[in-house]
Amino acid sequence: MKALIDAGVVKFGRFVLSSGIESPFYVDLRRALGHPDLVKWVVSGYLSALSRLKFDVLLGVATGGIPYASILGYLLQKPFGYVRAGAKGYGTMQAVEGADVAGLAAVVVDDVLTTGNSLINAIKAVREAGGEVVGALVFLDREQCGSQNVRRETGVEVFSVYKMRELLETLKPYIGEGHYRAAVEYLAKWSC
């Protein structure tokens, strides 16, 4: 697990997230892509979580979910594609690219879940393209109400490989008491 720190996947300090929320930690799973051993570990976690779901197609959420949905689709020999943040304004003007999803059971894959807005938008896009979303899968749920927001807005269950508190416990020996305490206190402020 120290490799997550060494590779810069998990960082501690002051960060502003894409949601505009300030956080004492940042998780950037894209950094794992430069480390094959970490990719193998991350994909193994995703595969374990996916074993609970029956689906036809995997769709990565742009951009963090795309590489992992692609790897998973290849390994499982399932069609895969991705969901853009918005439909492109040219060509076919689609929001869902790659695999055709019409009439298929889809799992939407993302890397990190905070508020759930990216997943909510992706689920809506898949439904608009005729797909049935049977689950959403993230590697890390930051435990900031994202899974509850997704369920409330879409009815879709979010599955995660890790919850942030679990990850913090695992990383505690490598991050120091101050960072650990700041992160735990920060998470305690979130009640869903």
Swiss-Prot record:
GO terms for molecular function: magnesium ion binding; orotate phosphoribosyltransferase activity. InterPro entries: OPRT, Or_phspho_trans_dom, PRibTrfase_dom, PRTase-like. GO terms for biological process: 'de novo' UMP biosynthetic process; pyrimidine nucleobase biosynthetic process. It catalyses: orotidine 5'-phosphate + diphosphate = orotate + 5-phospho-alpha-D-ribose 1-diphosphate. Its cofactor is Mg(2+). Keywords: Glycosyltransferase, Magnesium, Pyrimidine biosynthesis, Transferase. 5-phospho-alpha-D-ribose 1-diphosphate binds at R84, K88, D110, D111, V112, L113, T114, T115, G116, N117, S118. Orotate binds at T114, R142. Pfam families: Pribosyltran. Gene3D superfamilies: 3.40.50.2020. Its EC number is 2.4.2.10. Pathway: Pyrimidine metabolism; UMP biosynthesis via de novo pathway; UMP from orotate: step 1/2. Signal peptide: none annotated. NCBIfam families: pyrE. HAMAP family: PyrE. Catalyzes the transfer of a ribosyl phosphate group from 5-phosphoribose 1-diphosphate to orotate, leading to the formation of orotidine monophosphate (OMP). Homodimer. Belongs to the purine/pyrimidine phosphoribosyltransferase family. PyrE subfamily. This is Orotate phosphoribosyltransferase. The gene is pyrE.
